[in-house]
Structure formats: structure tokens, C-alpha cells
Amino acid sequence: MSWIINGASHDWEVVIGLEVHAQIVSNSKLFSGASTEISVDPNSHVALLDVAMPGVLPVTNEYCIVQAVKTALALSCEVKKYSVFDRKNYFYPDLSFGYQITQFYHPIAKNGHIMLDESADNKKIGIARIHIEQDAGKSLHVGDKTCIDFNRAGVALMEIVTDPDLRSPEEAAEYLKKLRIILRYIGACSGDMENGALRCDANVSVRKVGESALGVRSEIKNLNSIKYVAQAIKYEAMRHVEVLESGGKVEQSTLLYDVDTGTTRTMRSKEDVCDYRYFPDPDLLPLEITDEFIASIRDTLPELPMAKMSRYMNDFSLSRYDAVILSSDRDVAEYYDEVMQRNLPGDLVAAWVTGELFGMLNKRGMCISDSPVRADALGDLLRLMVDGTISGKMAKQVFATMFETGKSASKIVEEEGLQQIADEGVLSAMVERVLEKNPDKVQQYKQGKEKLFGYFVGQIMQETKGRANPEVLNALIQSKLSQ
């Protein structure tokens, strides 16, 4: 949904484009054999190439290309058969080469999209291009000194660039959430923004409602959380409107967002393309990608979140809410799918996974991959409940014991004698005894005090320690009281 800012003289439409830098999951860097592990001592994983030592040439890491092609396919992009690495020339202390190896003229993929608002108008956010590039090092400021850690230098990145299709901070946030889910699903990027594995630059401009030409844009760099992306866009759009409404002119610039003040500040004036003097890297051969190579990667793609969500809603009759929760995390979805192999009701399994299981995991700060109750074990428990061996109340008790001990549901039920009593003869005798002991309450019930029905049920549940089958018991009591 478009965000329209009401100014004193005009209504303004916000136009947003995002550039997402996704760190590729790979054991080694893009052009050197150094490890990509960065949570170690500074400058521990640095090859000669990473610090631009003379005489060392780059060698392309094929696995990074595979990951980029996989991402392109997952985002419905056109994978280019011919792709070239270029040099982007600029100076920065943590960029030893004096240039960044990236792709400008011939990126690896173009023309993809992500769908937003599936429940409403299915808005399509275009992805203009995906290109591969190397990351820079990290500057660390200590007092009046600046130290540089080159562990990150040369790590492979994908820059995923949208068309200027986003129209509000909320749409930008939703796009980022969906992109991160997809990247995690296919294993191309961890998506951990707090660790810098996913960073976002937001391009923001405004224009008068009804105009087609784009306004002058500001680029907000290195936003490391979805919340800050939305906040920064909102502030910058309002600033643009304030400048224009007062008769001023928005200057093209590169900005940083200050999370403490909630404002942007100028980092540098925005460069034009010509300032970077792009040209093909003479040390690297072009990438020539075949149809067979693309097909082999396509075969490795998992069922993607949108398709999985639709399947859950169509095949298992799940609500949209449950389908979104279950499909948004690949580990959760695989857990749910494995439980469903027991031919159980889809809504029942969804309720248990998102309710009982998530509740236990959250209390202990655990993720589903660490759950002591595996998917097959939960399936066995729910099968006992569906088959009538134990009641729903008993199932929760058994589940808690399973979580603490790791024992199977059937073993716990056997050891604790929790099997439901469903024998009509046994329960009928109990019902008769309870009614005979309470003739006054039977009379009151027949005179219209129907709440006493729960009293009779409670007496038998107390006698059986909750093991009486509720359906059988209710039917028997109803039958006896109607005589």
C-alpha cells in the first residue's frame, strides 16, 4: 500500500528501492582459499590476495557461483549465460586493492521478483539484478586510531537490487522479511543482520502524487535491522517533503542512519556511475553458464515458502495464519511435514507444533532443531490421542514428560497407566453408581438445572483420574439422564 504524505501544498508519494548485500554461505572466500569464518581474532583468516599482495591472482570460487544461481532461480530471475567481473574503483582504507571486484555491465541475473500481500492484491516487487562482489574489510575505531580487520575482506556477497517498486516503509520491511526467508530456505545466506550477513541500503525519493518522474534520491547505507530500515525510510521521506515544501532542493547524497537520534546524517555526496570508472577485470575470465549447469542447480531447490504455504492451506486446510508460521522457517516446515506422515489431521498437528511445542521451546530458549521431542515422537503421541488411547488432556501431560525425559509416548502411557477407559460396560456401571448416589441432583437436572451435567462428568473423571473417554462418558450420562 502506498504511503502518501500530506504536505501543505501537495500530496507526496514515497518511492523506495532497496539494495541488499547478502553474504554467501561458503567455506572459503570468493577469490581466495581463506576461511569465511569471521568470529575469530582480527586478521586470522587472510590470504595474500585479500590484502592485495603483488603477484597473487584471483581464482573464482565455483560454489559461490552455484549459490548465486540458486538464489536467482528462487527469486524467479533470468540467469545470464554470460557474466563478467568488473573493477569498481574507489579508495577506502579497508579496501586494499583500491578497487572492488564486482559485476556492473554483465550481472549474473536479472528480472526477478518477490510477491507481497498474498492475501490482498499480490503486489509484485521487481528485482532488477543480482550481481556477485567481494566484501571489504572492517574498520575498527579505537580512540584516535583506526584498525582494520581483513577477515571479512574477499568474502562473497550477492547484491540484490530491486526496482523502485516499494511505496512505504511497511512494504520495504515485508520485502526484506520475505527475501530473508527465501535466502535461509535455500541455504544461500544466513540472513543474520545483527552479524552483518545481510545488510541493506535504502534509496528514498518522493514525488508529487500523479507524477511519473522520479525525484532526487538519497541512499541510506548499511542498515542492519528491518526495524531500522523502516524507521530510516520514514524519517528520510518526511525530510524530503519538508525540504521541498519549504522551497528547497533535495541534494543527491549518501547517508547514515543514527539509531539513537532517529535521524539521518550525510556520509558523502552521492557519486555518479562515472566516478567509479568501471571496467572488466583483466585477471578474471568471464563466467559462461550453461543450461545444464542451471538445470542441475534447479533440481536442488527445495519447495519454497510460498509454494509450501499454499500446499498447507490447500492440502491440509490450514488457516493462512498457521500456514505462514509453519512455512516461514524451513526447519519448522520439515518438522511439520514429518509429523504429517502419520496421516494426522493437519489442523491438529499445526496446533500442537505452534502451541505446545513452541511453548516448551520458547521457555528454554531452544530452536526446533534442538527439540528433545522429535517429529516422529510427536506424531506417535498425536496418533495415540486421535485413536482414543489417551485424552487431549492426558496428551499434554505425556508431552511434558516426553520433553523432559526423552521417553516415547507409548512407554510413558504404559508406565503411568494413562490409557483411556472407553469400555461402555465399565463406564456405564460407574455412571449408574454416581446417579444412584445423587438422586437429588438427578431430579434438579431433570427440572432444568443442566449445569449439573458437568458435576456428573467430574465425579467419574475424579474416580478414573481423568482416564474416562469424554465422548463415550458424555453419551452414557446423557442416555441415563434421559430415561
Curated annotation (Swiss-Prot):
One of its GO terms (molecular function) is ATP binding. The lineage of its organism: Bacteria, Pseudomonadati, Pseudomonadota, Alphaproteobacteria, Rickettsiales. This is Aspartyl/glutamyl-tRNA(Asn/Gln) amidotransferase subunit B. Heterotrimer of A, B and C subunits. Allows the formation of correctly charged Asn-tRNA(Asn) or Gln-tRNA(Gln) through the transamidation of misacylated Asp-tRNA(Asn) or Glu-tRNA(Gln) in organisms which lack either or both of asparaginyl-tRNA or glutaminyl-tRNA synthetases. The reaction takes place in the presence of glutamine and ATP through an activated phospho-Asp-tRNA(Asn) or phospho-Glu-tRNA(Gln). It is an enzyme of class 6 (ligase). It catalyses: L-glutamyl-tRNA(Gln) + L-glutamine + ATP + H2O = L-glutaminyl-tRNA(Gln) + L-glutamate + ADP + phosphate + H(+); L-aspartyl-tRNA(Asn) + L-glutamine + ATP + H2O = L-asparaginyl-tRNA(Asn) + L-glutamate + ADP + phosphate + 2 H(+). Belongs to the GatB/GatE family. GatB subfamily. Keywords: ATP-binding, Ligase, Nucleotide-binding, Protein biosynthesis. Its EC number is 6.3.5.-. Pfam families: GatB_N, GatB_Yqey. PANTHER family: GLUTAMYL-TRNA GLN AMIDOTRANSFERASE SUBUNIT B MITOCHONDRIAL AND PROKARYOTIC PET112-RELATED (PTHR11659), GLUTAMYL-TRNA(GLN) AMIDOTRANSFERASE SUBUNIT B, MITOCHONDRIAL (PTHR11659:SF0). SUPFAM superfamilies: GatB/YqeY motif, Glutamine synthetase/guanido kinase. GO terms for biological process: glutaminyl-tRNAGln biosynthesis via transamidation; translation. InterPro entries: Asn/Gln-tRNA_amidoTrfase_suB/E (IPR017959), Asn/Gln-tRNA_Trfase_suB/E_cat (IPR006075), Asn/Gln_amidotransferase (IPR018027), Asn/Gln_tRNA_amidoTrase-B-like (IPR003789), GatB (IPR004413), GatB_C_1 (IPR042114), GatB_Yqey_C_2 (IPR023168), Gln-tRNA_amidoTrfase_suB_CS (IPR017958). It comes from the Bacteria.
